[in-house]
């Protein structure tokens, strides 16, 4: 392993601390809690939407979340290991066949829906036991 990769790994470990990073994939509906500083106040703002892309590049990993807010589409890019992200919660798993869902930008309404991924009984049993 080269020196840069080693340093990136240490930095990821420092940024995540003891909390593991939530596993999610494109097509999943997630709620990203973001720390927002307004003057002297610090609050947590939730951004809920569909993950349309995920970029796995070590420390530079990022993902794009798309939501429809009062009829207008909003896309926001988040750095995965950013200190501004308080938490990432997966609300629903999506069943998609693509890694990048940019085609959703051209669709609206029912055509932009994503099927829910059904978990098999065997996988469910392993998770519980």
Curated annotation (Swiss-Prot):
Keywords: Ribonucleoprotein, Ribosomal protein. Transmembrane segments: none annotated. InterPro entries: Ribosomal_bL19, Ribosomal_bL19_CS, Ribosomal_bL19_sf, Translation_prot_SH3-like_sf. GO terms for biological process: translation. PROSITE patterns: RIBOSOMAL_L19 (PS01015). It comes from the Bacteria. One of its GO terms (cellular component) is cytosolic large ribosomal subunit. Coiled coil: none annotated. GO terms for molecular function: structural constituent of ribosome. PANTHER family: LARGE RIBOSOMAL SUBUNIT PROTEIN BL19M, RIBOSOMAL PROTEIN L19. Belongs to the bacterial ribosomal protein bL19 family. This protein is located at the 30S-50S ribosomal subunit interface and may play a role in the structure and function of the aminoacyl-tRNA binding site. This is Large ribosomal subunit protein bL19. It comes from Bordetella avium (strain 197N). The lineage of its organism: Bacteria, Pseudomonadati, Pseudomonadota, Betaproteobacteria, Burkholderiales.
């Amino acid at each position: 392993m080269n020196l840069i990769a080693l340093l990136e790994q240490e930095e990821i470990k420092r940024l995540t601390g003891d909390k593991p990073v939530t596993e999610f994939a494109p097509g999943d509906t997630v709620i990203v809690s973001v720390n927002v500083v307004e003057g002297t106040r610090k609050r947590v703002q939730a951004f809920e939407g569909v993950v349309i892309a995920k970029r796995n590049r070590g420390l530079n990993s990022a993902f794009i979340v798309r939501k429809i807010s009062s009829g207008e589409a909003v896309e926001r890019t988040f750095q995965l290991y950013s200190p501004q992200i308080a938490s990432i919660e997966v609300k629903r798993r999506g069943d998609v066949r693509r890694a990048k869902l940019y085609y959703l930008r051209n669709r609206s309404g029912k055509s932009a829906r994503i099927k829910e991924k059904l978990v098999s009984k065997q996988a469910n049993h392993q998770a519980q036991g």
